[in-house]
């Protein structure tokens, strides 16, 4: 099973809490995390893109770096680990993304990939006049299909003459073009999985619940069904937060402390922003992100326990059919990557 790190490009990582570690994003922090991950054999590092935060007492995600420029820097200071940047497809034309991907591939040959997101938080785009209107919630995958068609044309052949509703290419060219650029799509709705099965190499999905490592299995089954229709082999990377310590009790006490300190003002903003996307159905990622059960960490799957307990749960995840790997976040990234490399990974059957 592959293991990746979802690096903290935004302040405070993925805990919307007043009692979790508080920090600003920086190149130096993410360089140290990524180089440490490479040392311990992590397969890839991925960064998100976030253009507007949730506010609150912690100013959650109000401070963010930009994904492509950050990953270009990290590509230059690493040698083996794969590097994925995220593009908010409403903000950057596909021809420019193709040229940026070509440039980063020149820095790190064969190591760069792109994560595609359609955009769901209206405030990110309306603040700069880029929100296309409420119809985007229901038409976004039609837009993304055209976007990705152009992007793949340019990445694979260096030329696109695509003519569509949203994009018109007239002998558009990108050279040099990389030999292979893997594409990831984050989406758990039926429409999102259908798109991934047709266009992407990997699906990026949220784990579910606390210490329920295989609860996401139905998403893999739905992706498999979608991939059968396209005849393509597409597997999943599943996102989990790890909160580990010497004992289960110590780890659970930390998790409870973070929950007790939840930034309610920021969580209210998250719920408000996610509401319009609810029309897309209960299987969307944003429905899960804002659910009240564990919004403090965006309701991603959470593994809490001793190093031994975490290793066993990760092996359970690896055994779920269709799982290519896990994408990990930590309450404390530097310590978390260190503990994973020295205390958790050596106990995993799926990593030996």
Curated annotation (Swiss-Prot):
Q: Which reaction does it catalyse?
A: uracil + FMNH2 + NADH + O2 = (Z)-3-ureidoacrylate + FMN + NAD(+) + H2O + H(+); thymine + FMNH2 + NADH + O2 = (Z)-2-methylureidoacrylate + FMN + NAD(+) + H2O + H(+)
Q: Which GO terms describe its biological process?
A: alkanesulfonate catabolic process; nitrogen utilization; uracil catabolic process
What Enzyme Commission number(s) appear in the record? 1.14.99.46
Write down the Pfam families for this protein, in alphabetical order.
Bac_luciferase
GO MF, one term, reads: alkanesulfonate monooxygenase activity
- Give UniProt keywords alphabetically: Flavoprotein, FMN, Monooxygenase, NADP, Oxidoreductase
Please name the InterPro entries in this protein's record.
Luciferase-like_dom (IPR011251), Luciferase-like_sf (IPR036661), Pyrimidine_monooxygenase_RutA (IPR019914), SsuD_RutA_monooxygenase (IPR050172)
Q: Which residues bind FMN?
A: 49-50, 115, 124, 140-141, 189
Function summary:
The FMN-N(5)-oxide reacts spontaneously with NADH to produce FMN. Requires the flavin reductase RutF to regenerate FMN in vivo.
The family classification in the record reads: Belongs to the NtaA/SnaA/DszA monooxygenase family. RutA subfamily.
Q: Which NCBIfam families match?
A: RutA
Name of this protein: Pyrimidine monooxygenase RutA
């Amino acid at each position: 099973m592959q293991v990746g790190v979802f690096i903290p490009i935004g302040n405070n990582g993925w805990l919307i809490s007043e009692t979790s570690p508080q920090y600003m994003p920086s190149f130096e922090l993410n360089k140290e995390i990524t180089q440490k991950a490479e040392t311990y054999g992590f397969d890839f590092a991925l960064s998100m893109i976030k253009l507007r935060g949730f506010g609150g007492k912690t100013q959650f995600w109000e401070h963010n770096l930009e994904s492509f420029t950050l990953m270009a820097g990290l590509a230059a200071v690493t040698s083996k680990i794969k590097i994925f940047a995220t593009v908010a497809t409403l903000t950057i034309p596909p021809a420019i993304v193709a040229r940026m991907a070509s440039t980063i591939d020149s820095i790190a040959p064969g190591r760069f990939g792109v994560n595609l997101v359609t955009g769901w938080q209206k405030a990110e785009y309306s603040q700069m006049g880029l929100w296309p209107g409420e119809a985007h919630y229901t038409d976004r995958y039609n837009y993304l299909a055209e976007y990705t068609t152009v992007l793949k044309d340019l990445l694979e052949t260096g030329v696109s003459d695509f003519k569509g509703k949203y994009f018109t290419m007239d002998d558009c060219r990108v050279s040099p073009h990389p030999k292979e650029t893997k594409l990831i799509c984050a989406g758990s709705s039926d429409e999102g999985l259908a798109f991934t099965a047709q266009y992407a190499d990997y699906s990026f999905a949220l784990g579910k619940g606390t210490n329920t490592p295989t609860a996401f299995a139905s998403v893999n089954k739905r992706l498999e069904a979608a991939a059968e229709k396209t005849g393509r082999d597409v597997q999943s990377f599943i996102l989990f937060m790890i909160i580990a310590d010497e004992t289960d009790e110590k780890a659970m006490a930390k998790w409870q402390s973070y929950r007790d300190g939840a930034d309610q003002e920021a969580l209210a903003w998250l719920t408000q922003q996610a509401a319009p996307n609810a029309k897309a159905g209960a299987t969307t990622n944003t429905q899960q992100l804002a659910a009240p059960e564990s919004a403090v960490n965006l309701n991603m799957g959470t593994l809490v326990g001793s190093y031994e307990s975490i290793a066993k749960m990760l092996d359970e995840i690896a055994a779920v059919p269709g799982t290519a790997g896990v994408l990990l976040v930590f309450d404390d990234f530097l310590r978390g990557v260190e503990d994973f490399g020295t205390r958790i990974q050596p106990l995993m059957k799926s990593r030996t």
